[in-house]
């Protein structure tokens, strides 16, 4: 059974660029037969986005300018293991998460 794996990268840290390079490397090497990979980027200012764009944009630090970003947060409910995403219609959708890999 394929698991939903959330890779979280970026953040308000002096290690921001290291996180981006590491995330790109991890994403290039994950086994897609075992994982449905979902990426969540955090800008230097602390904004959280679901990212569906190209891995090179992560490594080149231009991912947040991409139209493939959608505001998102992790569910604050301990029992609800999901990513909450604001869709184009202004409604919230949940994406179930099995594993979180912070980079």
Give the ranges of each region predicted by the language model.
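ATP-binding N-terminal substructure of ATP-dependent carboxylate-amine bond-forming enzymes
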Residues: 1-103
């Amino acid at each position: 059974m394929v698991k939903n794996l959330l890779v979280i990268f970026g953040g308000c840290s002096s290690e921001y660029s290291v996180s981006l390079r590491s995330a790109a490397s991890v994403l290039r090497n994950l086994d897609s037969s075992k994982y449905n990979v979902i990426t969540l980027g955090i800008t230097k200012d602390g904004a959280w986005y679901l990212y569906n764009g190209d891995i090179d944009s992560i490594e080149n630090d231009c991912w947040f300018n991409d139209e493939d970003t959608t505001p998102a947060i992790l569910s604050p409910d301990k029992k609800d293991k999901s990513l909450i995403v604001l869709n184009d219609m202004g409604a919230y959708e949940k994406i179930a998460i099995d594993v979180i890999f912070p980079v």
